[in-house]
Curated annotation (Swiss-Prot):
Keyword set, alphabetical order: Virulence
CDD domains: PaaI_thioesterase
Metabolic or biological pathway, per its Swiss-Prot or TrEMBL entry: Secondary metabolite biosynthesis
SUPFAM superfamilies: Thioesterase/thiol ester dehydrase-isomerase (SSF54637)
Recorded phenotype for the gene knockout or disruption: Leads to highly reduced verlamelin production.
Function: Part of the gene cluster that mediates the biosynthesis of verlamelin, a lipopeptide that exhibits antifungal activity against plant pathogenic fungi. Verlamelin is a cyclic hexadepsipeptide and is bridged by ester bonding between a 5-hydroxytetradecanoic acid moiety and a carboxyl group on the terminal Val of amide-bonded tetradecanoyl-hexapeptide D-allo-Thr-D-Ala-L-Pro-L-Gln-D-Tyr-L-Val. VlmA and vlmB are altogether regarded as essential components in the biosynthesis of 5-hydroxytetradecanoic acid.
Signal peptide coordinates: none
Protein name: Verlamelin biosynthesis protein B
Organism whose genome encodes this protein: Lecanicillium sp
Amino acid sequence: MEVKKLEFIGPRVMPGGQKEMDYFCQVPEFQQRCQSGNAVVIPRRDQVADGRGSTGKLFSQTLNTADTIPHCIVMFEDTYTAQSSTQPWLPISTCSVFYQLGEGVCGFGNICHGGIQTTLLDDVMGVLGVLNARLQDGIIPSKVPGAYWPRNNPGMVDLTKSLFATQGIEVKFLRPLRTPQVIEVSAQLVDMDVSGGSFTVQCVIRDMKGKQYAVANANWVIHTPRPRSRL
């Protein structure tokens, strides 16, 4: 009897992401998340040296071992819609990072340490900012060429020449997060200050069945370097 394979409509995979994509596609729930034609996948540990911490040693070395976080990948939806709002806004408002957690991130027994969970929550919030900056800069090509250039979008906050950092974060742990397992950490833009100088993000840790383990709310500030005055 011939077995018909279901056609897999995968996401757009950015350079360097295929190896991690192949790994996570072994997880059925991840495959389901990839069915959207707007999904874009990029490596969390990449080689783009744009000074935004994406290749910092915490994730590229310290947590990049077989028993800590051997695999991780970023996913977001490229669903560009032209806006004419004069209120501050960003190209994408949500993203997810999938992590394979090993036993080396545990603080007691097989329970992931709360400090590691907080680090992951903060990390994904930062990834959301980096994705927006790279879409604006064209480092990540958009489905519609030039769609996310700030000069073409009134009210869009330009992150291409800005630095952004956590100002404050509040974390609530809901239940023990056991390892090893694959988790999804999702960040959602909640609000932007009317001045465009800060934004609020909510982030959630879930297992691949959708159960929540930790929730964080954080304020992020945007630092735009002032032009040097001429003597």
